[in-house]
Amino acid sequence: MEPNLQFWISERQAFFRRFCQWMDLLDPVNMFISIGSIEKSRQLLFTTEDAPKHYLDNQVIKDAWNKSLSTVHPDSSKLIPHLFRPAAFLPVTAPMVFLLMMPDTGIKSIILTQGCLYGYTTAFNITNGNASYSHGPVERTLLGAGVSVSSTFIGLIPHLFQMKYPPNNFWLKRTLPIVFLAQVSGMNVFASRSFENHRGIEVMDKEGHVVGHSRKAGRKAIKDTAKSRAVLFGTSALAPELFIHIFKRTRFYPQTLLSLVILRMSSTFFMMGLMVPVSFSMFPQIGQIQCSQLEEKIQSSTEEKELFYYRGV
């Protein structure tokens, strides 16, 4: 069995432990791990008996797991491209969210930032989603292009609306783009990973033996990931607005434009740094579903009451 898949099946731990694991996996250093180092770490995991059980009590094994989990896809056993590894998500998206939430930004700047943000998140979702369904590179490329363009267009709606009908209410002006950012980010996951819902993903027993392909499991995997992504971007954009609004009422509020920009940037980066591991930890990487909730063909092919599937990041 693929070591990463074996690890996530055996490690269905509580939220706090998942959070601590993601804090390790999101270390930016993991973007630059060499292929040789990855192969050496995975060889150690292959040759170590019950390697998942030694994650906490053996530092060498723990380091090997962190290198493997942060760079290799659990479904395909292929290396994840450097730019789309989980560790790259925060440093790539945080500056975009900051620029997107800057007040009084021109429409050209908004279009460029939206395009970059949704172009990246679409590719990230496809790369780190479940890869057990049948697919080809051309159809995935066409799907990704369509999703990124449509997400960018939908994300522009509140900005275009405010340009034509400027709202008098401050909170409506500032929160409407945030609501759209959260909603479109969730919809982006649904759209970019729609093949999982239409074609089904592998469901397996606790030993990792594949029982069949389930569209219902694919739908659940996408739904959970979409929720976490909406929470991530919605909270990361809303919290700095609340902080700055409250801070304005104090005597410590800076008056220079540069100080205001630095304050907004710091609060946005802080919230993104907190919410990325929180959102990735909201649901286990290996989802669990009752066999009775799946298709009749799968129910008739196994006696297991609970089956597992890879949710994706």
From Swiss-Prot:
Name of the protein in its database record: Sideroflexin-4
Record-stated family: Belongs to the sideroflexin family.
An individual GO BP term: amino acid transport
GO MF annotation: an example: monoatomic ion transmembrane transporter activity
Cited function: Mitochondrial amino-acid transporter. Does not act as a serine transporter: not able to mediate transport of serine into mitochondria.
Localisation per UniProt entry: Mitochondrion inner membrane
PTM annotation (N6-acetyllysine): residues: 173
Topological type in the membrane: Multi-pass membrane protein
Lineage: Eukaryota, Metazoa, Chordata, Craniata, Vertebrata
PANTHER family assigned: SIDEROFLEXIN, SIDEROFLEXIN-4
Segments traversing the membrane: 87-107, 141-161, 175-191, 230-247, 269-289
Keywords noted in UniProt: Acetylation, Amino-acid transport, Membrane, Mitochondrion, Mitochondrion inner membrane, Transmembrane, Transmembrane helix, Transport
Entry GO terms, CC: mitochondrial inner membrane; mitochondrion; nucleoplasm
Gene name of the record: Sfxn4
Superkingdom as given in the UniProt entry: Eukaryota
Expressing tissues: Largely restricted to kidney, brain and heart.
